[in-house]
């Protein structure tokens, strides 16, 4: 009989894409997978395309609420909990995997109530609120980076869609890949279009910014795209990546052995992007520039100062940090339960 596994992940790509990598690895085994997410996250668009049954509940945020809004949120939270209990009773999972986010938090507590083994995975170097709570009750905690949790946890790395990258040889101009995630990053977009140095640029703008960014580039040689489906190919092309420091981006930089200039999102919860970026910077695998310090002069100077030897060394250092077997390691543990 197939093992029933409920994956809980929703809201942002940082939770969804590593969960999807695990789900795809689980498909290589005799398992029955279902997914619990929120009604507003991008999982609604992505998960069904992978032939995985998706359950959704109304997402409720609790941080930064006024008293009235908090009371309303608590009522909605109670309703969402009942919804999730119903999903558990119908599916009857043998084990539950929480990847962070609202539905993972409530689902993890419901798993505890029903005495179903709970496994969690934290993608960032600084744990989110949900996993800080669930870490106390989980049967097993996986973390992407060392020392995220005080309690004993296994460092697996982040599950990535690709396993390796064949870097292209570039003997001419520097290839700069600019990425800001699926939604793009306006500050990075704005400063990148001011670059006036002799390099090759591939700029992923995000859906909302494509037309504006395309219009700002005077050099038609620049490749501008809304979204990059094949990130392995993009990293293979790039000598250096200019990007934010989300957990998945940082892990992809490691696995693809790609040097980076990292501009952490300054308002990320618990400043986790700064600490993600610091892992690469401290290992001389990336260059960290805080957004408040970012100027076109500094960016151009940084790019012009990067030479081939530095690229080679940073690439080697990034790869040393990579955890290429994250999905398999987590799946092997999930399958170990009777």
Swiss-Prot record:
InterPro entries: GlcNAc_MurG (IPR006009), Glyco_trans_28_C (IPR007235), GlycoTrans_28_N (IPR004276)
This enzyme's EC code(s): 2.4.1.227
Source superkingdom: Bacteria
A GO molecular-function descriptor: UDP-N-acetyl-D-glucosamine:N-acetylmuramoyl-L-alanyl-D-glutamyl-meso-2,6-diaminopimelyl-D-alanyl-D-alanine-diphosphoundecaprenol 4-beta-N-acetylglucosaminlytransferase activity
One GO location term (cellular component): plasma membrane
Pfam families assigned: Glyco_tran_28_C, Glyco_transf_28
CDD domains: GT28_MurG
Bilayer topology: Peripheral membrane protein
Subcellular location(s) per record: Cell inner membrane
One BP annotation, GO: carbohydrate metabolic process
Keyword field: Cell cycle, Cell division, Cell inner membrane, Cell membrane, Cell shape, Cell wall biogenesis/degradation, Glycosyltransferase, Membrane, Peptidoglycan synthesis, Transferase
Pathway entry: Cell wall biogenesis; peptidoglycan biosynthesis
Catalytic activity: di-trans,octa-cis-undecaprenyl diphospho-N-acetyl-alpha-D-muramoyl-L-alanyl-D-glutamyl-meso-2,6-diaminopimeloyl-D-alanyl-D-alanine + UDP-N-acetyl-alpha-D-glucosamine = di-trans,octa-cis-undecaprenyl diphospho-[N-acetyl-alpha-D-glucosaminyl-(1->4)]-N-acetyl-alpha-D-muramoyl-L-alanyl-D-glutamyl-meso-2,6-diaminopimeloyl-D-alanyl-D-alanine + UDP + H(+)
Residues that bind UDP-N-acetyl-alpha-D-glucosamine: 12-14, 124, 182, 228, 273
Described purpose of this protein according to its UniProt entry: Cell wall formation. Catalyzes the transfer of a GlcNAc subunit on undecaprenyl-pyrophosphoryl-MurNAc-pentapeptide (lipid intermediate I) to form undecaprenyl-pyrophosphoryl-MurNAc-(pentapeptide)GlcNAc (lipid intermediate II).
Family as reported in the entry's similarity comment: Belongs to the glycosyltransferase 28 family. MurG subfamily.
PANTHER family: GLYCOSYLTRANSFERASE (PTHR21015:SF22), UDP-N-ACETYLGLUCOSAMINE--N-ACETYLMURAMYL-(PENTAPEPTIDE) PYROPHOSPHORYL-UNDECAPRENOL N-ACETYLGLUCOSAMINE TRANSFERASE 1 (PTHR21015)
Name of this chain's protein: UDP-N-acetylglucosamine--N-acetylmuramyl-(pentapeptide) pyrophosphoryl-undecaprenol N-acetylglucosamine transferase
């Amino acid at each position: 009989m197939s093992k029933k596994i409920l994956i809980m992940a929703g809201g942002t790509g940082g939770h969804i894409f590593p969960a999807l990598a695990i789900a795809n690895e689980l498909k290589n085994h005799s398992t029955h997978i279902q997914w619990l997410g929120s009604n507003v996250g991008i999982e609604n668009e992505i998960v069904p395309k992978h032939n995985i049954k998706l359950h959704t509940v109304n997402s409720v945020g609790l941080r930064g609420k006024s008293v009235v809004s908090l009371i309303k949120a608590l009522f909605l939270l109670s309703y969402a909990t009942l919804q999730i209990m119903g999903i558990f009773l119908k599916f009857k999972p043998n084990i539950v995997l929480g990847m962070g986010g609202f539905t993972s938090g409530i689902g993890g507590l419901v798993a505890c109530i029903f005495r179903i083994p709970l496994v969690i995975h934290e993608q960032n170097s600084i744990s989110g609120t949900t996993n800080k709570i669930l870490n106390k009750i989980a049967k097993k905690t996986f973390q992407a980076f060392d020392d995220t949790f005080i309690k004993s946890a296994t460092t697996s790395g982040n599950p990535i869609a690709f396993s390796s990258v064949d870097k292209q040889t570039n003997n001419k101009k520097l290839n700069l890949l600019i990425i800001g995630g699926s939604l793009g990053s306006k500050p990075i977009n704005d400063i990148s279009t001011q670059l006036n140095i002799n390099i090759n640029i591939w700029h992923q703008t995000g859906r909302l910014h494509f037309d504006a960014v395309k219009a700002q580039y005077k050099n038609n040689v620049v490749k501008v795209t809304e979204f990059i489906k094949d990130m392995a190919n993009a990293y293979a092309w790039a000598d250096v990546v200019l990007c934010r420091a989300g957990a998945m981006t940082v892990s992809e930089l490691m696995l693809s052995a790609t040097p980076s200039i990292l501009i952490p999102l300054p308002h990320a919860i618990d400043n986790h992007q700064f600490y993600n970026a610091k892992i690469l910077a401290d290992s001389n695998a990336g260059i960290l520039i805080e957004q408040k310090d970012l100027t076109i002069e500094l960016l151009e100077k940084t790019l012009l100062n990067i030479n081939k030897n530095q690229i080679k060394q940073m690439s080697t250092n990034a790869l040393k940090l990579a955890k290429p077997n994250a999905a398999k390691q987590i799946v092997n543990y999930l399958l170990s339960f009777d």
